[in-house]
C-alpha cells in the first residue's frame, strides 16, 4: 500500500520531510508515515482543534481504533518544540495517519473535495466498464444482499416500535376500562344507598349533629368533673393526715415538673404512681436531649386533683396547658414563679 513517504521531496530535520499532496504542501514524519495535520489546517486557513471537535472526526477516530485495534494516543501524536527556531517551527504540531488526510483536506478546501469527488466517480465508472459479466453479476448480488439486509434490519426495528406502540395502546385501553368500572361501581353504590333511604348529604349532616351532641356532653362532663374535683379536694385536705400512705413506695403518687428542649412546650408534668412516673420520666429522656426535673412532689392521696387546681389558678396568669404540656412564654410569670406557684398550691391542702 502506498505511503505518504513516497510524496516527500526535501528533508527538514531528522525524519521530518516536506511533501506534496495534490495542491497541498505537507510535512511528513517518515518514521511513522504520518502527516502534520496542524500545519495542513493552517495552510487552508483553518484550525486543527476545530476539525477535531467535529462529529465526523470522532467517528473516523472510533472507526480506525476498532479496525486497527489501537488506541487514540497511537493514532495521533504531538511534536513540541521552540517555535522561535525556524527549522523546529516547521515540524511542530499534531500528526495523524494518512487515512485522515482526505477528510481534513476536503474540510479545508471545497475545490479539493470537488477534485477528489470527480476522481472517485471516474474510478468507479471505469471499474464498472472494465468488469467482466461474471464479476459484475457477483458485485450486483453482493450489493443487493447488503441492501436487503439493511431493509430487513430496518423492518425489524420498525416492527419492534410498532409492537411497543400496540402494547401502550392496549395498556391505555385497560386503564380506561378500569376507570369506567370504578365509575360504574361508585354510581351503583350511591344508587344502593339511595334505595336504602340513605343519602351521603344526610349521613354528613347526621355526623355533624352527633359531633355537636358529643361536644355538649364533653362540656357537661367537664362541669361535673370540676364539681367532683372540688369535692375530692376538700376530702383530700380533710383526710390527708388520716389516710395511710400505700405500704409499697412504687404505688405512691408523684407530681413531677420537667423542663425539656422543646420550642413550643418546654415544661411537662407527670402525675402518676411512682412506678409509672419513673417510666414516663424515662420516655421523656429518650425523646429529648435535655431533660431536667424542676419539681418532684409526693402527693397524697391523689396527684390528679393537684394538677386540676394548678391549671385553674395558673390559667388566670396566662399559662397555657395542653394535656401534660405547659408553656409560660406569653404568661405573667417566669420559671421560678411557676415552680413556687405549684409548691404553694400543693401546700394549700393543709389550710383547713
Swiss-Prot record:
Sorted alphabetically, which keywords does the UniProt record give? Answer: Coiled coil
Question: Can you give the residue ranges of the KilA-N domain?
Answer: 15-123
Q: Name one Pfam family in it.
A: KilA-N
Q: Sorted alphabetically, which PROSITE patterns does this protein's record hold?
A: KILA_N
Ranges in coiled-coil conformation: 129-236
What is the protein name stated in its UniProt record? Putative KilA-N domain-containing protein 006L
Keyword DNA-binding appears in the UniProt entry: no
Amino acid at each position: 500500500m502506498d505511503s505518504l513517504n513516497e510524496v516527500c521531496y526535501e528533508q527538514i530535520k531528522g525524519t521530518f520531510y516536506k511533501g506534496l499532496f495534490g495542491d497541498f504542501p505537507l510535512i511528513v514524519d517518515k518514521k511513522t508515515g504520518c502527516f502534520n495535520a496542524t500545519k495542513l489546517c493552517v495552510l487552508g486557513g483553518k484550525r486543527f482543534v476545530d476539525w477535531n471537535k467535529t462529529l465526523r472526526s470522532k467517528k473516523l477516530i472510533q472507526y480506525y481504533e476498532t479496525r486497527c485495534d489501537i488506541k487514540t494516543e497511537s493514532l495521533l501524536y504531538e511534536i513540541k518544540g521552540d517555535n522561535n527556531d525556524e527549522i523546529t517551527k516547521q515540524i511542530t504540531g499534531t500528526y495523524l495517519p494518512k487515512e485522515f488526510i482526505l477528510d481534513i483536506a476536503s474540510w479545508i478546501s471545497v475545490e479539493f473535495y470537488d477534485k477528489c469527488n470527480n476522481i472517485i466517480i471516474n474510478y468507479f465508472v471505469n471499474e464498472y466498464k472494465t468488469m467482466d459479466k461474471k464479476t459484475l453479476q457477483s458485485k450486483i448480488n453482493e450489493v443487493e444482499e447488503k441492501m436487503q439486509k439493511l431493509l430487513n434490519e430496518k423492518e425489524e426495528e420498525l416492527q419492534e416500535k410498532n409492537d411497543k406502540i400496540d402494547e401502550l395502546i392496549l395498556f391505555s385501553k385497560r386503564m380506561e376500562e378500569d376507570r369506567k368500572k370504578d365509575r360504574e361501581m361508585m354510581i351503583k353504590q350511591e344508587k344502593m344507598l339511595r334505595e336504602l333511604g340513605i343519602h351521603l348529604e344526610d349521613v354528613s349532616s347526621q355526623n355533624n349533629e352527633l359531633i355537636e351532641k358529643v361536644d355538649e356532653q364533653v362540656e357537661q362532663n367537664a362541669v361535673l368533673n370540676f364539681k367532683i374535683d372540688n369535692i375530692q379536694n376538700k376530702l383530700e385536705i380533710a383526710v390527708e393526715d388520716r389516710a395511710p400512705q400505700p405500704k409499697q413506695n412504687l404505688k405512691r403518687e408523684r407530681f413531677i415538673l420537667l423542663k425539656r428542649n422543646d420550642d413550643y412546650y418546654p415544661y411537662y408534668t407527670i402525675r402518676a404512681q411512682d412506678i409509672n412516673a419513673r417510666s414516663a420520666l424515662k420516655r421523656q429522656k429518650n425523646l429529648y436531649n435535655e431533660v431536667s426535673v424542676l419539681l418532684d412532689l409526693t402527693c397524697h392521696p391523689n396527684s390528679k386533683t393537684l394538677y386540676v387546681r394548678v391549671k385553674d389558678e395558673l390559667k388566670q396568669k396566662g399559662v397555657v396547658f395542653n394535656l401534660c404540656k405547659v408553656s409560660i412564654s406569653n404568661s405573667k410569670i417566669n420559671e421560678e414563679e411557676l415552680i413556687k406557684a405549684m409548691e404553694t398550691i400543693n401546700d394549700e391542702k393543709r389550710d383547713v
